[in-house]
Amino acid sequence: MPAEQLRSLQRHERILDAATRVFATKGYHGTLVDEIALEADTSKGGVYFHFPNKQAIFLALFDRLADILRERVESAVAKENEPIARAEAALRVVLDTFASHRRLARLFMVEALGAGPEFNARMIQIRATFADLIRTHLDEAVAVGAIPPLDTATAASAWFGAINEVVIHWAVADNPGRLEDCYPTIRALLLRGIRAQSDLPPDSVARVDTAASATDADGDLGAR
């Protein structure tokens, strides 16, 4: 890599690191580009050379965290052979990753409300990606008989929602414990939820599936 290109890349990363600190301290709306430039030890023009505006910096930080999370999850899942073990590995990695990036967790999951439609769309996309990942492994678990048949789309959303709520509670706590210590409890609750389907009468599962199908069929009512 040419020296000038390397310096540009290093400056780009330095700006993002500085932005993480400033955003985490002042929040998205309270942060000025001038403050990011000062923290990054560069000029305001130097920041704008890499990013057209504050929102672009924010989105780049979000993408950075999402990429880290995705890579770690894929690596952990690839080491497991059983579908439930893969889902458990994904859960564990998500908690471990947020545990080591508390500033970013608080920033994106708590303080980013109102950051704009582009950020909201990106957040929805990321949530859907990870919910689909969980659903894939739950589908595999159903297929091999590891868990009883169930509405895996709803179960995956519930899993993601539970993780999301635990991370938010930890991120805003004044004296948070270790996020990764929550793993055994969350794991037990989530696995108990999907395995409890085997204790339901057969027609109960059928009714859930029928209701889910009806919801899918009427899903466009809100747009009419």
Feature map (PLM): residue ranges:
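Helix-turn-helix
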Residues: 14, 18, 22-56, 60
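Hydrophobic alpha-helical connector segments
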Residues: 60, 74-103, 155-159, 183, ...
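C-terminal peripheral helix-coil segments that are non-catalytic and often amphipathic
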Residues: 2, 93-100, 131-132, 136-143, ...
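Hydrophobic/aromatic residues within well-ordered alpha-helical segments
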Residues: 11, 54, 61, 65, ...
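Amphipathic alpha-helical packing segments from all-alpha helical-bundle domains
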Residues: 67-70, 117-144, 153-157, 181-184, ...
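Amphipathic alpha-helical segments used for helix-helix packing
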Residues: 99-120, 135-136, 168-172, 203
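Amphipathic alpha-helical linker/stalk segments
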Residues: 3, 61-90, 134, 138-143
